[in-house]
Amino acid sequence: MLKFQTVRGGLRLLGVRRSSTAPVASPNVRRLEYKPIKKVMVANRGEIAIRVFRACTELGIRTVAVYSEQDTGQMHRQKADEAYLIGRGLAPVQAYLHIPDIIKVAKENGVDAVHPGYGFLSERADFAQACQDAGVRFIGPSPEVVRKMGDKVEARAIAIAAGVPVVPGTNSPINSLHEAHEFSNTYGFPIIFKAAYGGGGRGMRVVHSYEELEENYTRAYSEALAAFGNGALFVEKFIEKPRHIEVQILGDQYGNILHLYERDCSIQRRHQKVVEIAPATHLDPQLRSRLTSDSVKLAKQVGYENAGTVEFLVDKHGKHYFIEVNSRLQVEHTVTEEITDVDLVHAQIHVSEGRSLPDLGLRQENIRINGCAIQCRVTTEDPARSFQPDTGRIEVFRSGEGMGIRLDNASAFQGAVISPHYDSLLVKVIAHGKDHPTAATKMSRALAEFRVRGVKTNIPFLQNVLNNQQFLAGIVDTQFIDENPELFQLRPAQNRAQKLLHYLGHVMVNGPTTPIPVKVSPSPVDPIVPVVPIGPPPAGFRDILLREGPEGFARAVRNHQGLLLMDTTFRDAHQSLLATRVRTHDLKKIAPYVAHNFNNLFSIENWGGATFDVAMRFLYECPWRRLQELRELIPNIPFQMLLRGANAVGYTNYPDNVVFKFCEVAKENGMDVFRIFDSLNYLPNMLLGMEAAGSAGGVVEAAISYTGDVADPSRTKYSLEYYMGLAEELVRAGTHILCIKDMAGLLKPAACTMLVSSLRDRFPDLPLHIHTHDTSGSGVAAMLACAQAGADVVDVAVDSMSGMTSQPSMGALVACTKGTPLDTEVPLERVFDYSEYWEGARGLYAAFDCTATMKSGNSDVYENEIPGGQYTNLHFQAHSMGLGSKFKEVKKAYVEANQMLGDLIKVTPSSKIVGDLAQFMVQNGLSRAEAEAQAEELSFPRSVVEFLQGYIGIPHGGFPEPFRSKVLKDLPRIEGRPGASLPPLNLKELEKDLIDRHGEEVTPEDVLSAAMYPDVFAQFKDFTATFGPLDSLNTRLFLQGPKIAEEFEVELERGKTLHIKALAVSDLNRAGQRQVFFELNGQLRSILVKDTQAMKEMHFHPKALKDVKGQIGAPMPGKVIDVKVAAGAKVVKGQPLCVLSAMKMETVVTSPMEGTIRKVHVTKDMTLEGDDLILEIE
C-alpha cells in the first residue's frame, strides 16, 4: 500500500510497503509479474554509489559495493553491506569498466539488480545486455534503448522522427579528420566535437578555426577513448551563448511517461556543469511546455523506461534544439528531487521491480514545482590555475549544514586521500528555498561554513558565482563564466590555524626556521607586561606634529624646556644586542605601556635600517605590518626611522622614483621622522633622501655620520670645520632637525661640548639630536655633555637593553638630569617597569644575545672605530669560527683596512666594506703593506671592488690611489651620484609580476619590499604562503616549537583563540615524511612534514623553480600520456610540449617561450606531482 503526505500544494510519496501484489496497469497493457529486489549492486564509486545505497537501505534492500585497488580507502565500500574488489591489476578507470569482473561479483553474491550510477558503464548498452544475460536486472532503460540513446547519432535520428528540433550535425560518427574538415566547410565555425558514447564534458571540444581543428580532434578522441572505452566522435554546429536546459523524465514498463520539469545547467566550464538550478529561472511558460512535451514525446517514441534526462540548447530567441538523452541518473538529479519531492532512486528501483508510475502515485497532474533548488559541485580543483585538479590528503574537513541544505558526498573526511585517478568531485551541496535568491543565500551561507584544508577547492569561485548579480537575477547562459572574469578574483582562504600547525610541526621535525647561532633555549618565563590603564593614552609630540606639521613640530622641540629622549629599544638597541631578532609579537606587548607612560618622548626609533630585511629574511614577518600595528598601539609618540639616503632601507642604489615612493608609503603607514644619512656623508645621496622624505610630508632629520675626534687637533680629515661645513649644506637644503649620528660611540665629552656648542651657536633655532653607542662605556657622560652644550634630543635605550654596543641607559640619563634644567620629566619608576619587561623579553632571545660571546664593551673602539652593531657581529663571527682568540687581529685588520680605503665614515654599508676587507686580510694572512703591494693580483671582495668603482658614492677626500687603480684596472667607474643614471623602475610592471608570481593581492607595500629586496621578499612570500603569518605565536614556540603534551593558546585576533596541544611525532615514512599529531580546539589534527635531513638521502623527482625562466613544471598532478618534444628541439611560444591526464581530463602543457629544449625530465606513463620538472628550455 502507498502512503502520501500533502506537501506545499502537492503530494509527496512517503514510501511503498513492499508486498507481492501485482502492480496496477492500464487495461490495455500487459500486466507484468512483480519481482521485488532483495540485493542491489552499484557498479560505480563515490557519492552516487552511496546515494543509491542509502535509498536501498530505506527500502530494506541489501547493498553490494565494488571497488578498484586504488579505492580501498574510499567510503563507498564501507557504506555497503558487502564490498568486493574488481579489476585487479587494471588501470584505475579500467577497473570500473571491466564488465566480466562486475558480472562475476553479481552472480557469485546473489545480486538481483545492478544500478550503474552515472559515468563509467551507465550508458553502455553492452553492460546492460550483459546484466540481462546474466539474469541480473539492470536498473535503467532496456539495453536497446541504452544503445539507441547512447549512440548520439541514432538518438538524433529518433528526435528528428519524433518531430523534435535538432542542431545541424553529422548523422553518424566521423571516422577521420577529413570528415571534420568537410563539415566545417559546409556549416562554418564554430563547431563542436562530442563523444558518441558518453557525456560529462569528456571528449568534447569547441573549435573556432581550421588551425585548431587537428589538435582538438586528437584530444577529443583521446579523452572519449579514455573515459568511455570508445573514441568515436560526432561533430555539429556550435550554438553560441545558449542556455543549457534539461528535462527529467521517468517511465515505467507499461508505457507511462512523465516529466519532472527542467533544470538549468548553463553554468559550465569546459562543458562540465558547475552549478545547476531547478527550475530554470525566467523561463517562458510556453517554452517550458514545449521542452517538457518534446521530452515526453521523444521518450515515448523510443519506448523509454526508468529515469533519464533529455537535454536541450535554447538560443537567445527562445528556440530550442535537442542535444541528447542521458539514459541514466544525472549528477544533478538532486535539485529535481528537492523541488518535486520525488525520490528518483526509489522510483528507479520500483520501476525495475515491475511497478507502474500510477502505482507509485506519480501522475503528471500531481507533479508540482515547490520552490527553487541550487546544486554546487564542490571539487578539488584550483580556480586560480584554470581549475587544475588538486590531489593530496584532506587535513581538515568541516561541512556547512542547516535548514534547506542537503549534502551528497563520499570520501570527504579528515585523512581522506584525493588521488589523480578519478573525478575531482568532493561533495555536492544542494540548497532549497522558496525562490532563487533564497536558495542562493542558503547556499552561500553553507559554503562559507565549509573548511577544507590540505587540497585546493573551487569554493571561493562558487561563492563569487553565488554573489554575482547576474546569477542572482537568474540570467545565465553557457558563456556566463567566460564573460564574468571577476568570478576569478578569488579571496584566498586565511587557513591560519592549519598553517600554524604546519609551522609548529615543521619546527618539531626539522628544528628552527631561523638560523640559531648559539644553542641556548629561550627562557621558559614569559616577560611581565606592566598594567596599562584603560582609555586613550595622553597627548604627546605626535599630536603637535599632526596639528602643526613638520615646521611646527620642530619649533615645539626647540622650545621645549628640558632634555628630550629618543628611545631606541624598538630598533637599534636590539639590532646591537640581539642581532635584530626581536619580533613584532614582543614589541606589541609592551607598546601600550609605552604609549601611556612615555608620551613625552621626542620619538621612538622602531623602523628602517637592518630591521627591514631581517623582518622578512629571518622573522618571516612583514616590516610594513609591524609599522602599522605599532602605529595603532602608539598613536601619540612620533615614530622615527633610519633612511640610508639614496639607498632607502637597502644596501644598494635604487632608482630615484623607488626612494620617493618608499617615503610616501612609509608616511602613509604611520612613519613621522625620517633620519636621513649616507654612509660616506656623500651630500648628493643625502639630498635625494631629504627631498623624498620632505615631499612625502615627513619630518626631515638630516644625520651627519660622525667619525674621528674633533677635539684631537692631530685628526685633521674629519675636523670641526668639516662637520660645520656639512651642516651648513644640510640646513640650506631645508632639514627640519639636525642629527649627529655617532654609530661607533666615538664622541668623548670634550668633543661633544666642542661640536654641539658650535652647532648651537651657528643654528640657534634648529633642533639638535645626538645619536651614539655605548661600546666604550662613556655614553651617559657623552650624552650629558651634549645636553649641557645645547642638544635638544639624545638617544637612549631602556636599562636592560642598554650599554655595551647599544645606546646609553635611559634610567641613568633620567636620574642624572632629574631636578636640573635638563629634567626629562620621565618617571623613573616607569622606566623600572619598562626595563623589567625587556629583561624578561631578552631572555627569549638568548640564542642571539651578544653576551653569549661578548661580556662587556671595550674602549678600544676609539682605536678601531667599529660601529656598535658591527662590533657585535664581528665578535660573534670570530668566536663561531673558532677564532675568538684572534678577534684582536680582526680589529687590527679593520683599522688597516679602513686606512687602505682612505679612512672612511663607517656606517652601513661602508662599515661592511671595511669589515669585508679586514676579514679578507685575516683569512689570507695579509698585512696592509702586502695587500696594497699585491692589489693587482688579488681577488678582493665584491663589496670592496664596487666601492672603489663608485657604487655607493664618493668618500670625503676622494678614493685612495694608487690602490683604487690597481684593484679596478679596466673596470668601469661611476662618476657622480650612483643612482642618478638609473632609469625609473616600472612599479606597475613589478606589481603585475608579483601578482603573476604569488597569485594573490599585492599591496603597494609589497611592491616596495620587492623593489628593495627582490629575493628576500620572494622567499618571505613563499614561506608565509605555506606557514601563514606567525605573529600570533609566542617567541618560544616560534623558535623551538612545542614539546610533546604541551598545551598552549594562540590568539589569532580579538575573540578568536586556538587551544593547541602537541601529541606525537611519527616515525619516518617511505616518502621522507613524519606525521605530527595535534589536538586543536579539542579535535584531532595531523599533518605530514618532510624531514629535510632524511630527504637528503632519498631520491625525488626535481621540482621546477618558479624563478628560473625555462623550467617547465607540471601544472597539476597526473600521468604523462604523451611527450611531444625531445632534447635539442626548437620550440615556439604556445607549442604543445606534453600531455598530462588527471581525473579523466587531459591537459596540454604548452611552451611559455621560444627556445631550444635543453633537457626532458619525463617519459610517457610517468606519474607526476604538481610542479614536478617536465623539461627545460633555453
UniProtKB/Swiss-Prot annotation:
Pathway assigned in UniProt: Carbohydrate biosynthesis; gluconeogenesis
InterPro entries (alphabetical): Aldolase_TIM (IPR013785), ATP-grasp (IPR011761), ATP_grasp_subdomain_1 (IPR013815), BC-like_N (IPR005481), Biotin_BS (IPR001882), Biotin_carboxylation_dom (IPR011764), Biotin_COase_C (IPR005482), Biotin_lipoyl (IPR000089)
Catalytic activity: hydrogencarbonate + pyruvate + ATP = oxaloacetate + ADP + phosphate + H(+)
Posttranslational mods: Acetylation of Lys-748 might play a role in catalytic activity regulation.
Textual note on the cofactor: Binds 1 Mn(2+) ion per subunit.
In-chain residues carrying the UniProt-annotated modification N6-succinyllysine: K79, K442, K988
Residues recorded as bearing N6-carboxylysine in the entry: K741
Ranges for domain ATP-grasp: 156-353
Residues recorded as bearing N6-acetyllysine in the entry: 35, 39, 79, 148, 152, 241, 297, 316, 319, 434, 589, 661, 717, 748, 892, 969, 988, 992, 1061, 1090, 1124
Domain Biotinyl-binding: start-end pairs: 1109-1178
Designated name of the protein: Pyruvate carboxylase, mitochondrial
Modified residues (Phosphothreonine): T1003
